[in-house]
Curated annotation (Swiss-Prot):
Gene3D superfamilies documented for this protein: 3.40.50.880
Example of a GO biological process term: 'de novo' IMP biosynthetic process
Source organism per UniProt: Streptomyces coelicolor (strain ATCC BAA-471 / A3(2) / M145)
Subcellular location: Cytoplasm
SMART domains associated with the record: GATase_5
A Pfam family assignment: GATase_5
Enzyme Commission number, as recorded: 6.3.5.3, 3.5.1.2
Name by which UniProt lists this protein: Phosphoribosylformylglycinamidine synthase subunit PurQ
């Protein structure tokens, strides 16, 4: 039976179709979920994609966190449902307190769009198991509010528990503390990151790299072997 991965679309989402395409390339079935849906249609995992949900009013992800679909996502994530938040999706996960910390505007106050070098720090999550710890990858990055922040106690816990999933290499593009590009929850089923793996899954388009594909093959293998 084909694994079914839901992709949530909020008003202002930009990368839902790209994410659905990445899921197909990996061999799973994408399932479109609307922000007003309360039923997740029996999906096996959920992706919150990038964009500017609700125009980023109040704060990036702050309004989307209260969409009807998020009530169900939060409940099921706490029960073990794999959830991936990409860019705006990462912001939403922090607003929903499924991941600690928060996101602020880039320290240089400019929108950035670049291919970003990352190091995989944790390859033991639902979404990263097809990588190896220490692996260096290149993933497209595009954001205005990508600066990850947290208090010192939270940062120390993330580092001590191995919950930093990805770290920026060569340069810190937005001022994120500890060069953090992505993190995971303690259980490893919820992962959020600012770069866009869905834009790096096919060699014929974009950068020509497929460094983002393991996100989607990782979750597929986990679901198939569950």
């Amino acid at each position: 039976m084909t694994a079914r991965i839901g992709v949530v679309t909020f008003p202002g989402s930009l990368d839902d179709r790209d994410t659905q395409r990445a899921i197909r390339v990996a061999g799973a079935e994408p399932v479109a979920l609307w922000h007003k849906d309360k039923d997740l249609k029996q999906v096996d995992a959920v992706v919150l994609c990038g964009g500017f949900s609700y125009g980023d009013y109040l704060r990036a992800g702050a309004i989307a966190r209260f969409s009807p679909v998020m009530d169900t996502v939060i409940d099921q994530a706490k029960a073990g449902l794999p959830v991936l938040g990409i860019c705006n999706g990462f912001q939403i996960l922090t607003e929903a307190h499924l991941l600690p910390g928060g996101m602020l505007g880039n320290d240089h106050l400019h929108f950035i769009c670049r291919d970003q070098k990352l190091r995989v720090e944790n390859a033991d999550t639902s979404w990263t198991s097809d990588y190896t710890a220490g692996q260096e990858i290149h993933i497209p990055l595009k954001n205005m509010d990508g600066r990850y922040v947290a208090d010192r106690r939270t940062l120390d816990e993330l580092e001590a528990e191995g919950r930093v999933a990805f770290r920026y290499l060569d340069m810190n593009p937005n001022g994120s503390l500890n060069d953090i590009a992505g993190i995971t929850n303690a259980a490893g089923n919820v992962v959020g990151l600012m770069p866009h793996p869905e834009h790096a899954v096919e060699s014929l388009i974009g950068t020509g790299r497929t460094d983002g594909l393991p996100f989607f093959t990782s979750i597929l293998k986990k679901l198939v072997n569950a």
